Every structure is written in structure tokens, then in C-alpha cells.
Amino acid sequence: SDRTGIDPCNTLIQLNEFDERTRSLIGNRLFNICCLVFNPSSSSEYSQFQFLKPSYRVSRLSQIGSDFCRALLSDVFNLPIRKALGARFDWVFEFSKISDVISNAPYNEVLDILWYTCSWISRYTTAEFSNEMYKALNSLFEEEYVGYRFIAGEIVPITDKSEAVEIEQACHTPFDGARTQLQKALCFLSDREHPDYKNCVKESISAVESVCKVISGNEKAALKDALNGLIANGMNIHG
């Protein structure tokens, strides 16, 4: 508060630049997430067995943090790896490289390394843990007026909470074709340097078309024909 000499929270949407406070909070939250996965003894509330996928609970239990470091140094920082496959990396030590990016790099690199880390963790953890991880980061984004959200594992530019909820729900449609096309649309949108709006819209329309074909029972129908078929059957498509 002003009374204690602390500036009030940022109230401007942060899209192309993140302030120092936001960067610190992102780094802290990501470090806490890594602690839960790579160093579960740091928290008495969680057991690593609870949120690791069953196939990794034995083979990866003692080395998952080291495996992450090896992937991070090679895939993200493009550094030569000079440790044998069985050698261990200290994830807390290597996290300093992530911290440096979050503290000093352009906004898009901050989001890239955040996405990479969460995506890697998501591959080894249960859906429940991954959902809670993304929810925690989205809450931080909302609190700090960051104009991005994690949606279906991608970071996309969006500021309205209701829009984020709608897109997230759409990405979990039971229709396989539509779900795949919406995921592609999000990937096109999530490219922060060169977002491909044209193909994003194209895939989104294709997703709508896929659902309409299934509902109308006509797999060969074009979007217009499928919509007309739904209307003829009494469906209100305008809300």
C-alpha cells in the first residue's frame, strides 16, 4: 500500500514488457513448482508419487530433476553436454539460468522458457497436477495484469477471463477432429514473434465445421450446408 511505501499493483495490461515485480513473481512461482516435482521433500503436503505418472514413478523418481536439466541445457540453451548419461545435474544450480532469463530477457523469451519448463513437467506428471500448475500460473497472470494465459498447454495472448474459460472448454470437446484443429489454432496464435492469425482463424473455422458435420449427420456437408441442416432441425445457433 502507499502507507507502507509499497507501490500499488500494476493496473496496465502487460503484453510486450513485464515489470520487475511480475518477473520476480513468475520466477518464484515457477521455482516452487519445480520444488514440488524435483524436490518433493521440500513440502510435507505432497508426495512425488502422487503426481508423477505411474510409468515414471519408479524409473524416474530419483533423477527427474537431472533429466530436466539435461534437456534444458541442450534444447533451450544449446550448450554442449559433457556429462555421462548416468551423471546427475543439480536442478537448483541450473535453475539460475532460468532465473536470469526471467529477470532480464525480453518478454517473449520469458514466456518461451516458462512454456518449455511447464510443458516438460506436464509430460511426466498427472493431468490433475498439470491443471493445477497451469491454474496457479494463470492466477498470477491475472493478478499481475499479464495479457497472456495458458490454454490447453499453450501460452496465448488473451486478457478476458470468460474468453479463456470458453476457449479452454472448447479445446476439451469430445469431437476428436475439432479438438485437433483447435489445438493447431492455438499453436498458430501462441507464436509470440510471428503469430499466424490467418491459419488460426482457418483452423478455428474448420473445427466448427467438424462439429457441425457430426451433429448434422452429414460428413460431406460444407459449413454453410451443415449449419442450414442444424437450423432446419430446430437448433438455435445464434445463442
List PLM regions with ranges.
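Charge-dense, low-complexity intrinsically disordered segments
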Residues: 17-20, 24, 104, 172, ...
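Internal, Lys/Arg-enriched amphipathic helical interaction segments that engage polyanionic partners
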Residues: 27, 32-180
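Amphipathic, oligomerization/interface secondary-structure segments
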Residues: 170-239
